Swiss-Prot record:
Belongs to the arteriviridae GP5 protein family. It holds the Pfam family EAV_GP5. This is Glycoprotein 5. Changing residue 56 to Q: Complete loss of infectivity. Heterodimer with the membrane protein; disulfide-linked. This heterodimerization is required for transport to the Golgi complex. Interacts with glycoprotein 4. The lineage of its organism: Viruses, Riboviria, Orthornavirae, Pisuviricota, Pisoniviricetes.
Length: 255
């Protein structure tokens, strides 16, 4: 596990702020934080309007469009003319109305803050490393934390329409819930039978025989407080000795 973490760090290098410029991280954030929903992309573009150099937007009477990294990402209308440059917000407002109408039902962490988006970028870049490390140190605490994160992103998916992402996190939540609940069940059972397991012997037919825990297992005969071995009614416990053998028993403990 440790070697895998070291290998990932060597392949990935230093944290993202060390080799991504602020604006590069911002551009990644624009198109990764909300890449599964058009409305999320539009919301980010509107928020980052002060950096119009990142986008090449043009407008005419019949067309508005923007390009990003030489790829046309937004186009409305026909007969586009790229001789007249405009801010990206003008293009988006022409197509989708004013800011207030667009942001009416946007979740707060999309509307507020480029910094939040960069933090999200860092978290997702190092998510596998974090999970590998914390699963090896605090396995169930990590699973519970991941369940909480999954719930947050399910809410985000419902708000923003990113149903694919919501489905992925819902599946993660379900799997981790099963693992955690299974462990909790075992803990509850261990607590429920904390005395029975150490102070008695449960026979195949379900009868409980008291045991002297002070005696070793190999003491004369056994550790039962009552003399002799417990009588096993095979017909009651297994139906027959044949059924017991079919169940894979290596040997039959006869009275």
């Amino acid at each position: 596990m440790l070697s895998m973490i070291v290998l990932l760090f060597l392949l990935w290098g230093a944290p993202s702020h060390a080799y991504f410029s602020y604006y590069t991280a911002q551009r990644f954030t624009d198109f990764t934080l909300c890449m599964l929903t058009d409305r999320g992309v539009i919301a980010n573009l509107l928020r980052y309007d002060e950096h119009t150099a990142l986008y090449n937007c043009s407008a005419s009477k019949t067309c508005w469009y923007c390009t990003f990294l030489d790829e046309q990402i937004i186009t409305f209308g026909t007969d586009c003319d790229d001789t007249y440059a405009v801010p990206v917000a003008e293009v988006l407002e022409q197509a989708h109305g004013p800011y207030s109408a667009l942001f009416d039902d946007m979740p707060p962490f999309i509307y507020y803050g480029r910094e939040f988006g960069i933090v999200v970028l860092d978290v997702f870049m190092f998510y596998p490393v974090l999970v590998l490390f914390f699963l090896s140190v605090l396995p169930y605490a990590t699973l519970i934390l991941e369940m909480c994160v999954s719930i947050l992103f399910i809410i985000y998916g419902i708000y923003s329409g990113a149903y694919l992402a919501m489905g992925i996190f819902a599946a993660t939540l379900a799997i981790h819930s099963i693992v955690v609940l299974r462990q909790l069940l075992w803990l509850c059972l261990a607590w429920r039978y904390r005395c029975t397991l150490h102070a008695s012997f449960i026979s195949a037919e379900g009868k409980v025989y008291p045991v002297d825990p002070g005696l070793p297992v190999a003491a004369v005969g056994n550790r039962l407080l009552v003399p002799g071995r417990p009588t096993i009614d095979y017909a009651v416990a297994y139906g027959s000795k044949v059924n017991l053998v079919r169940l894979g028993a290596a040997e039959v403990w006869e009275p």
